[in-house]
Amino acid sequence: MFDSIFKRKQDEQRFASEGRLPPGQAYTQRFPVLHYGSVPGFNAAVWDFRVWGEVEAPLRLNWAEFNELPRTKLVMDIHCVTKWSKFDTYWEGVAVRTLLEQGLVKPKPQARFVMQHAEHGFTVNLPLEVVLQENFLLATHYNGEPLTPDHGYPLRGVVGAIPAKAELATPYFWKGAKWLRGLEF
């Protein structure tokens, strides 16, 4: 046990010296579960994902349609505002910029922010330029497996740091909503 604690501390110091561990963060190999309230159920027959607001035309996709969209796989470091960081996490899902490239979503020129709408009325916003970066993903999978309900199954927004890409904005992990149902531009 003490060997693993010592190794974690060594890794933490190495990550900090490499600039991957932000000040005040602690390195973890676990994936903590943090949310308030109950975990919503999922019914593929009635679930939908919507895009609306400052877009040329609203979009609504059911679960099967959403899963037909081109997939993106990313390796990201995640930093939670509760002071933990996890490195080299593997995610799969749909990049918002793919929705634009496919012509499914066309933001109007005045669109500047994107509000993520999730179950239980939770919302969180990000600047449009962050949502269109490669470090923002509408994630369905983590480490090769579908998300677990506690981690946002079936869909969550994920924003993290891509190692060796310091030019990307790195908002903390909480800026990605669990149990995501739509995006409002």
Functional labels for PLM-detected ranges:
Residues 2-185:
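Structured, non-membrane catalytic/scaffold regions adjacent to prosthetic-group chemistry
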